[in-house]
Amino acid sequence: MRVSDFYFDLPDELIARYPKPDRTASRLLQLNGENGEITHRTFADILDQIHEGDLLIFNNTRVIPARMFGRKASGGKVEVLVERILSDTRFLAHVRSSKAPKEGAELWLGEDKLGEHHGVKMIMVARHDTLFELEIAQKQTALLDVLQQIGHMPLPPYIDRPDEEADKERYQTVYNKVPGAVAAPTAGLHFDDALLAQLKAKGVNFAFVTLHVGAGTFQPVRVEQIEDHKMHAEYVEVPQEVCDAIIATKQAGKRVIAVGTTSVRSVESAALATEEKGEHALITPYFSDTSIFIYPGKTFRVVDCLITNFHLPESTLIMLVSAFAGYRHTMQAYQSAVENRYRFFSYGDAMFISKNPHVNGLD
């Protein structure tokens, strides 16, 4: 399959640069994956689509204020985006500057917030392909504390504006728990505490995985044939209680509903690893990196329904949705969303999709 198969025209004005005032006020396009039927709703209506005994899988990662601005020892400007925390004081990062810093180079970050000559000193330890390993010079200073002081929320490039104070709350799910992501699991942004309480009262079950979303999620697919694409690695935790909840839900004849593509990739990674180990369970605990790439023709072992935002043209995420709902149904749904002026991407509207049991490639 070609990357261009997943292209669609998107008017710039449909890219949401700010969230709706209320989380549940977003629109919801419901797609029946089996027959392609489309229904237009609001996100609050999802309460009627999720039933007693169904299991919602949430990603409880917390977005860290991962973007820092500063200068090199030479005085040149530098921008640093944390990709992965390695220890309290070391991390991997993307670095933007006129010249890439060399091993041993000093960076002074956060002067935009702390004042000139009051930045936090970082040392460039090593380079790993496109990523730089940096260390805080003051060993007793923890990275997460530094980021709270000087970091900016890492809004996606297509939002195309500086971060604002409100983004600290709105570019974060209400159930976030484990710090480490540099991009939000955006399907979860539509849930507020009241909706979660209503779902609980209805008898809907919750389970929480952790996938720390990396900046690689915004990288374009640079090959012509999608099968040649190599996914970036992200760290995943699928604990025993999640596996138990999934198995119990399946045994009861209820649905496993993934909130977001990161939840899909988490549980499907765990199920695939279980199968590859030859174990006789559907899914077993998983604490490791995943580079799983789900595109049309791939098998879903766990997930029955998917809640997700609208994704970029030619992205790995629209490929995942096409694998789940069927290519033709997915592209028709996206065309309908554009025609009906849905809002796209991280701060945009959502879809509720049931799995197409008949998909295989470009159906």
Curated annotation (Swiss-Prot):
Q: Which GO terms describe its cellular component?
A: cytoplasm
HAMAP family, sorted:
QueA
Ranked from the top, the taxonomy reads:
Bacteria, Pseudomonadati, Pseudomonadota, Gammaproteobacteria, Pasteurellales
Q: Which GO terms describe its molecular function?
A: S-adenosylmethionine:tRNA ribosyltransferase-isomerase activity
Q: Tell me where in or outside the cell this protein is found.
A: Cytoplasm
Pathway noted in the entry = tRNA modification; tRNA-queuosine biosynthesis
Keyword annotations for this protein, in alphabetical order, are: Cytoplasm, Queuosine biosynthesis, S-adenosyl-L-methionine, Transferase
**Which transformation does this protein catalyse, written as a reaction?**
7-aminomethyl-7-carbaguanosine(34) in tRNA + S-adenosyl-L-methionine = epoxyqueuosine(34) in tRNA + adenine + L-methionine + 2 H(+)
Function in brief: Transfers and isomerizes the ribose moiety from AdoMet to the 7-aminomethyl group of 7-deazaguanine (preQ1-tRNA) to give epoxyqueuosine (oQ-tRNA).
- PANTHER family under this entry? S-ADENOSYLMETHIONINE:TRNA RIBOSYLTRANSFERASE-ISOMERASE (PTHR30307:SF0)
Q: What is its EC number?
A: 2.4.99.17
Listed under GO biological process in this entry are:
queuosine biosynthetic process; tRNA wobble guanine modification
Q: Which Gene3D superfamilies would you find in this protein's record?
A: QueA-like (3.40.1780.10)
Q: Which family does it belong to?
A: Belongs to the QueA family.
Mind telling me what this protein is named?
A: S-adenosylmethionine:tRNA ribosyltransferase-isomerase
Relate the assembly described in the record. Monomer.
Report the Pfam families cross-referenced here. Answer: Queuosine_synth (PF02547)
SUPFAM superfamilies in alphabetical order: QueA-like
